[in-house]
Amino acid sequence: MSDMHSLLIAAILGVVEGLTEFLPVSSTGHMIIVGHLLGFEGDTAKTFEVVIQLGSILAVVVMFWRRLFGLIGIHFGRPLQHEGESKGRLTLIHILLGMIPAVVLGLLFHDTIKSLFNPINVMYALVVGGLLLIAAECLKPKEPRAPGLDDMTYRQAFMIGCFQCLALWPGFSRSGATISGGMLMGVSRYAASEFSFLLAVPMMMGATALDLYKSWGFLTNGDIPMFAVGFITAFVVALIAIKTFLQLIKRISFIPFAIYRFIVAAAVYVVFF
């Protein structure tokens, strides 16, 4: 693979990762399709995907840095704006409660989960995740019990964490699972999305660090330029995608995302079967 060709592939996959990682459409499904079409598969490709995920995570850190530092008691300048109608405040405990279920299951069944990474499982996950998004829109309370991020209860955070376990099924979408779970638990669409992004930082950093540790042997010095391009591209695109997404969901429901998931599932079927 020529240098320019590999850098082009890195940029394309970085765009795909950045666009889809935090939207409820399954980045895994997209990466499988695009990687296959580009002929970029195997151990190096898996390591590359782990590295560019770090770029996407960094975008969330940049977007929510004041809120993230606030969770650990570090404040800069003016007090963090309160988001909600109650006098509550989102705390680190909410994040920990949201992490526990998936962390426990992920550690117990890590190898089993990795064995599920194949097109047929991803295709089914895309469909089921789309149905969950539709169910969340149809069954959510008419008036959210937690309109803002700071209105969330510990119970809601834990239940969102339980829904996050669905994302251990490759192709389901972590954001799709957590946002749907939040809405069904009475959290507003916007607040559920924000919580999903915040929850992504420790969850994805932990999972990515573990995967990177296990895949480090496949990384060579010659891969560094390609990995750097993918990382930077994923970071920039994810930053734009998150900002756009948070504005978009103020005006539309998740039904279009569900329909799009069904289209991607059909694409997986066409490409692989």
Swiss-Prot record:
<protein>
    <recommendedName>
        <fullName>Undecaprenyl-diphosphatase</fullName>
        <ecNumber>3.6.1.27</ecNumber>
    </recommendedName>
</protein>
<keyword id="KW-0997">Cell inner membrane</keyword>
<dbReference type="Pfam" id="PF02673">
    <property type="entry name" value="BacA"/>
</dbReference>
<keyword id="KW-0378">Hydrolase</keyword>
<dbReference type="GO" id="GO:0050380">
    <property type="term" value="F:undecaprenyl-diphosphatase activity"/>
</dbReference>
<dbReference type="GO" id="GO:0005886">
    <property type="term" value="C:plasma membrane"/>
</dbReference>
<feature type="transmembrane region" description="Helical">
    <location>
        <begin position="90"/>
        <end position="110"/>
    </location>
</feature>
<keyword id="KW-0472">Membrane</keyword>
<feature type="transmembrane region" description="Helical">
    <location>
        <begin position="45"/>
        <end position="65"/>
    </location>
</feature>
<dbReference type="GO" id="GO:0046677">
    <property type="term" value="P:response to antibiotic"/>
</dbReference>
<keyword id="KW-1003">Cell membrane</keyword>
<feature type="transmembrane region" description="Helical">
    <location>
        <begin position="222"/>
        <end position="242"/>
    </location>
</feature>
<feature type="transmembrane region" description="Helical">
    <location>
        <begin position="116"/>
        <end position="136"/>
    </location>
</feature>
<dbReference type="GO" id="GO:0009252">
    <property type="term" value="P:peptidoglycan biosynthetic process"/>
</dbReference>
<keyword id="KW-1133">Transmembrane helix</keyword>
<dbReference type="InterPro" id="IPR003824">
    <property type="entry name" value="UppP"/>
</dbReference>
<feature type="transmembrane region" description="Helical">
    <location>
        <begin position="6"/>
        <end position="26"/>
    </location>
</feature>
<keyword id="KW-0961">Cell wall biogenesis/degradation</keyword>
<feature type="transmembrane region" description="Helical">
    <location>
        <begin position="190"/>
        <end position="210"/>
    </location>
</feature>
<comment type="similarity">
    <text>Belongs to the UppP family.</text>
</comment>
<comment type="function">
    <text>Catalyzes the dephosphorylation of undecaprenyl diphosphate (UPP). Confers resistance to bacitracin.</text>
</comment>
<keyword id="KW-0046">Antibiotic resistance</keyword>
<dbReference type="GO" id="GO:0008360">
    <property type="term" value="P:regulation of cell shape"/>
</dbReference>
<keyword id="KW-0573">Peptidoglycan synthesis</keyword>
<feature type="transmembrane region" description="Helical">
    <location>
        <begin position="252"/>
        <end position="272"/>
    </location>
</feature>
<dbReference type="GO" id="GO:0071555">
    <property type="term" value="P:cell wall organization"/>
</dbReference>
<keyword id="KW-0133">Cell shape</keyword>
<keyword id="KW-0812">Transmembrane</keyword>
